[in-house]
């Protein structure tokens, strides 16, 4: 796991923003909505302090609920790569959205090394990682999910805010822009009430001059719970 500033963050699954999407259908989200939603996932993931960030710690219910809002529930990843076994309770009726393997790059002269300033430069830098992606899979209760629920996505350019205690230990609290992301993401319609096992796996071999061989492997033991209306 890496949480130093390298102008990247990999999150294999892993918002305080209202989402315009109601629910994920059985066929998945419309492809046109994914480039914006991937940016919103990063805004959620990077806004959470490192001490309680579910992308860094082994989250239980105390961390997987942090920052969640709206009808789509974000699942965290492992920043820098690695494996994790996690437990999380999800409100009934919520759709799920998460990366399988991805790479974010952003402009920040405050915490070098500088890997690009323009959107094109930032995208070009991450190409070796993206080209090396392989062995991508998502299973729910030991069954492969539909192909329409797992897609390669190139994000729209976005910005995000880092708190003082953030996942990039060398970066000061600030708003960073532009940022770009690319990788494989999955969306799941609301699950039935009760227990479910979700397994997410992805790999990238970008060579020794970039980031080497990265394996992302995360298992979620999910419990879908009824929502209490008061």
Give names to the regions the model predicted.
Residues 72-163:
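Extracellular-facing segments of soluble proteins and assemblies that are Gly/Ser/Thr-biased and enriched
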Residues 94, 192-199:
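A glycine-anchored, Pro-Gly-centered beta-turn/N-cap motif
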Residues 91, 189-193, 213:
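Surface-exposed coil/turn segments at beta-strand junctions on protein surfaces, enriched
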Residues 203-211:
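Short acidic/polar inter-strand loop motif in beta-rich domains
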Residues 24-73, 214-217, 222-230:
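N-terminal segment immediately downstream of the Sec signal-peptide cleavage site
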Residues 161-185:
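Aromatic sugar-binding surface patches on proteins
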Residues 10-22:
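Bacterial N-terminal signal peptides
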Residues 1-11:
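Bacterial N-terminal signal peptides that target proteins for export
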């Amino acid at each position: 796991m890496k949480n130093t500033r390298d102008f990247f963050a990999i999150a294999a699954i892993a918002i305080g923003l209202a989402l315009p999407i109601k629910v994920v259908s059985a066929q998945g989200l419309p492809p046109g909505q994914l480039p914006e939603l991937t940016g919103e996932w990063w805004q959620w993931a990077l806004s959470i302090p490192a001490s309680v960030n579910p992308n860094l710690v082994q989250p239980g219910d105390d961390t997987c609920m942090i920052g969640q809002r709206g009808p789509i529930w974000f699942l965290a990843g492992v920043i820098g790569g690695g494996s994790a076994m996690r437990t999380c309770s999800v409100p009934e009726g919520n759709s799920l959205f998460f990366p399988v393997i991805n790479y974010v790059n952003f402009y920040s002269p405050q915490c070098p090394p500088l890997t690009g300033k323009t959107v094109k430069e930032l995208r070009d830098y991450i190409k070796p990682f993206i080209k090396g992606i392989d062995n991508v899979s998502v299973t729910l209760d030991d069954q492969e999910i539909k192909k329409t629920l797992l897609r390669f996505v190139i994000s729209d350019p976005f910005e995000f805010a880092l708190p003082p205690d953030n996942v990039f230990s060398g970066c000061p609290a600030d708003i960073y822009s532009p940022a770009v992301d690319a990788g494989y993401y999955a969306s799941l319609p609301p699950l039935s009430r009760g227990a479910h096992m979700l397994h997410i796996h992805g790999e990238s071999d970008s060579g020794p001059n970039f980031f080497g061989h990265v394996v992302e492997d995360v298992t979620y033991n999910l419990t879908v719970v009824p929502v209490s209306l008061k």
